Swiss-Prot record:
Record's keyword terms, sorted: Cholesterol biosynthesis, Cholesterol metabolism, Endoplasmic reticulum, Lipid biosynthesis, Lipid metabolism, Membrane, Microsome, NADP, Oxidoreductase, Steroid biosynthesis, Steroid metabolism, Sterol biosynthesis, Sterol metabolism, Transmembrane, Transmembrane helix
PROSITE patterns assigned: STEROL_REDUCT_1, STEROL_REDUCT_2
UniProt name for this protein: Delta(14)-sterol reductase TM7SF2
Binding site for NADP(+): 311, 315, 338, 343, 350-351, 390, 394-398, 405
Organism field: Homo sapiens (Human)
Gene of this entry: TM7SF2
Amino acid sequence: MAPTQGPRAPLEFGGPLGAAALLLLLPATMFHLLLAARSGPARLLGPPASLPGLEVLWSPRALLLWLAWLGLQAALYLLPARKVAEGQELKDKSRLRYPINGFQALVLTALLVGLGMSAGLPLGALPEMLLPLAFVATLTAFIFSLFLYMKAQVAPVSALAPGGNSGNPIYDFFLGRELNPRICFFDFKYFCELRPGLIGWVLINLALLMKEAELRGSPSLAMWLVNGFQLLYVGDALWHEEAVLTTMDITHDGFGFMLAFGDMAWVPFTYSLQAQFLLHHPQPLGLPMASVICLINATGYYIFRGANSQKNTFRKNPSDPRVAGLETISTATGRKLLVSGWWGMVRHPNYLGDLIMALAWSLPCGVSHLLPYFYLLYFTALLVHREARDERQCLQKYGLAWQEYCRRVPYRIMPYIY
């Protein structure tokens, strides 16, 4: 019998019907984007040029490659870490421990790929396998999510997430029942959050760059920019891996299909969309425009990193000279809310930086197609939705102090606009 956890959290994502729709819509959207990027018209909207059959999607070679990739990243996860960090306090007052070695995994992966390429590894062949790889990644996500759902049936009540325990199997399968599913000290959610998907994303980008060099003699400036910008983003996330321990994904959401599919399939195969588009639809880009795009990305990164670093520094040590002079609002929980610095400009300055960078990643693809701007459109919707979830949780947690913060900082993401 499944454990219960008392009062159930309000349903999100449209409840069971919304969850059922997203179970189908998310994979369908991913495959549409993969097909559209390689088609002649490259249309974001409308049917793809051709729908592949199972003989195109299913490949034992792709399955072996995908399982080998997961195995490699799991092995790198188990290597000694430069640091072991404690997570947030759980319902039973305990704290889980997490290895901080994601950046180490990125570097070792890069070294292994470099050695493989020097030995003749045909990395440029990877773009031709994106469809079957995406198919086996999706299949893996469904099977893995079923395992997580079954595992949660015997988990103690204290291990369950605030949401994902509605009693509806489809909704709970989608959202995830258990907060931190583990076997021994291997944390499945933490592993998937930043490892196979993010590192896989930059590897796919590199393969697309290599393929363009094979086809056209050298990679285009636009391809270099997309690869460089997104490598910086992934490297930053893995270098500051410890910060993920305070995010909603880790502290609030259960681990179900939503995060499993997102981490393992959606991220590597849709976030690489700009590089996929450039391989099949090369775009001219001059140095003046490239310089402007670099400036836009640098501005977004400066805001993103500055806001996150300020928040993380304040959480670790409010007396740190870098944040000691910032104005705060006291809360009933004992924690303080920053109301100056980056967090006095808007309530989510890190989201603002994220969106500016998303624009910079799309601009090298030109303005003749909407498809490369899918990430910007999707990420805007995602962050607006996440911001609304943040607002509800913070209001519930901090009460009047949060209302005062919202009065002092009226704009949510973009100053004077939203």
